[in-house]
């Protein structure tokens, strides 16, 4: 069973995201965190395969979280999802070690287009290093 960690400070969007993913991909084990500190604690206990993190978080941001995760768990896939789909943020995300960078709108469209038998890693529409 694949495990994912959702890191998002907006509780309404976090709940919506979790419910949307669970509806489309019910075989995933999903845990959530609302900030970087909570995410790091969940990492130790949960060992997710993939982390979806917002770019802007309270206290520290998704870039700092990505750096910490990749330093300790380099095999974990990190996907930054954000409303700030700007080239400078994309570049900073990849420099911090993110594997993917997608806008929240694109991410939701991707999830909604999946059927329950597809895996998240099958979508390579935004591979690391893409412009």
What spans do the regions from the language model cover?
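Two-component/phosphorelay signaling modules centered on CheY-like receiver
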Residues: 11-31
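Active-site residues of response regulator receiver
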Residues: 54
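Short amphipathic alpha-helix used as the core "switch/output" element in two-component signaling
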Residues: 63-74
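Conserved acidic carboxylate
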Residues: 8
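The feature encodes the CheY-like receiver
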Residues: 58, 86
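Acidic catalytic/metal-coordinating carboxylates
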Residues: 35, 61-64
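Acidic, metal-coordinating helix/loop segments flanking the phosphotransfer/catalytic sites
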Residues: 32-50
């Amino acid at each position: 069973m694949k495990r994912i960690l959702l890191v998002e400070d907006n509780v309404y969007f976090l709940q919506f995201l979790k419910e949307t993913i669970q509806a489309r991909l019910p075989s995933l084990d999903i845990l959530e965190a609302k900030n970087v500190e909570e995410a790091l604690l969940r990492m130790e206990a949960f060992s997710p395969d993939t982390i979806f993190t917002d770019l802007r978080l309270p206290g520290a941001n998704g870039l700092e979280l990505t750096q910490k995760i990749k330093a300790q768990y380099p095999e974990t896939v990190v996907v930054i999802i954000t409303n700030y789909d700007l080239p400078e943020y994309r570049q900073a995300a990849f420099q911090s070690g993110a594997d993917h960078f997608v806008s929240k709108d694109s991410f939701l469209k991707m999830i909604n287009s999946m059927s329950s038998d597809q895996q998240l890693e099958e979508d390579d529409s935004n591979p690391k290093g893409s412009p």
